[in-house]
């Protein structure tokens, strides 16, 4: 068998043509320090702020500090397997989390990994956790109401889609309960909810998820949780991960409600990281950019203009105060960033007024724009009535003789406080809120005993459902009060049937005789 030189030459040329240079160049560094959720590495001269790095043991880190000789890295996972001298390499990409419909109904960690035991999440969509907030021209005014189902909030501090409304108060005053009840009330409202639990005990998160499942709210909710046992970097990135998941829906024209519960713990985690990375401490030992940490997060909530799809993301950040001190550093920062605050008073809470909202210090900077017209009409004087009542109540304690007008205002105030009370997970549809507030402001409750007010409310709701469902439907569909005196006549009709407790007791006694 003879081998021709031409054939050998052709084979060599063919091999050369198909040859690919598969040499990959990776920039690597050496770990010089590791501990408390952070590491330092030398040799990563071209690393970028916020870039993901990969350690030898498969754990990722994120560049936080860029210094002359090394980089400071926050470790996104278990740092116990990383030792001094290990290799760390650049990935060339920034931190991303999975997004999309597949996450709805799931409980995930800040990396987007499922932790609810229901299997992996199959989605190939991701978004960076850090994203520039929509600009001024990309937004439109907040005008669409977000109904919380809580009478005191919908009447006094209304929230609109695209707004940032702070929930602030001492521990154990019902902050999380308001957020959870608001999520529950979004059923059938074309809203996707995201609950970000930052630094909350696993048992607490489990209880919250069980509550959401009980009311069918997990059908439209994503829960992102970073427990206290996890490294501080996980608590720090949790709200940004939740915001990225929400932005995916917002930019597709959908409406999102996101709860950050709570940002005090995120600030504490960021302070811990910054001090370990030897950043200069400022007021209360927080780093100088703690304001920017929260502002760049909360500014991502917006109502996009119609050209961008008209989607919205409404944020309810939660802040915990110490002894009601809203003038501390973090509370004042977040108050100045948000569009209003719901302040919960511990004294009111322990005296049985729940939700324990302080009408004097709570405010919504969007105001009546986020209310339906019917609610605006019936709740217009409510705040003034409450303020006057609080002022007169303290004056009346001195035992002075009061004229009839003052006594009438005190009586109206007592009944207003009673009407605004609401049990846990007892959401009220907006039409029913309008009906009971209409009855209150038109004097139908003035002659009732305070103890009868909530019974009157519940029986009125039942009566309207049974006999005047058309009036409720009219308020729901049009957003206006029914024409003419139809609502007034219906409530008067019910007044004639309602039996106050004293009369009911007398009737029962006569029947027994």
Swiss-Prot record:
Record-listed E.C. numbers: 7.1.2.2
Molecular function terms, GO-annotated: ADP binding; ATP binding; proton-transporting ATP synthase activity, rotational mechanism
Pfam families referenced in this protein's UniProt entry, alphabetically: ATP-synt_ab, ATP-synt_ab_C, ATP-synt_ab_N
Site, as annotated: Required for activity: 362
Lineage: superkingdom: Bacteria
One Gene Ontology cellular component annotation held by this UniProt entry: plasma membrane
Reaction it catalyzes: ATP + H2O + 4 H(+)(in) = ADP + phosphate + 5 H(+)(out)
Record keyword Protease present: no
Enzyme class: translocase
Keywords: ATP synthesis, ATP-binding, Cell membrane, CF(1), Hydrogen ion transport, Ion transport, Membrane, Nucleotide-binding, Translocase, Transport
Keyword Magnesium: no
Residues at which ATP binds: 169-176
Subcellular location field: Cell membrane
Membrane topology: Peripheral membrane protein
Self-association and partners: F-type ATPases have 2 components, CF(1) - the catalytic core - and CF(0) - the membrane proton channel. CF(1) has five subunits: alpha(3), beta(3), gamma(1), delta(1), epsilon(1). CF(0) has three main subunits: a(1), b(2) and c(9-12). The alpha and beta chains form an alternating ring which encloses part of the gamma chain. CF(1) is attached to CF(0) by a central stalk formed by the gamma and epsilon chains, while a peripheral stalk is formed by the delta and b chains.
Role this protein plays: Produces ATP from ADP in the presence of a proton gradient across the membrane. The alpha chain is a regulatory subunit.
Entries under PANTHER family matching the protein: ATP SYNTHASE SUBUNIT ALPHA, MITOCHONDRIAL
Family as reported in the entry's similarity comment: Belongs to the ATPase alpha/beta chains family.
Protein name: ATP synthase subunit alpha
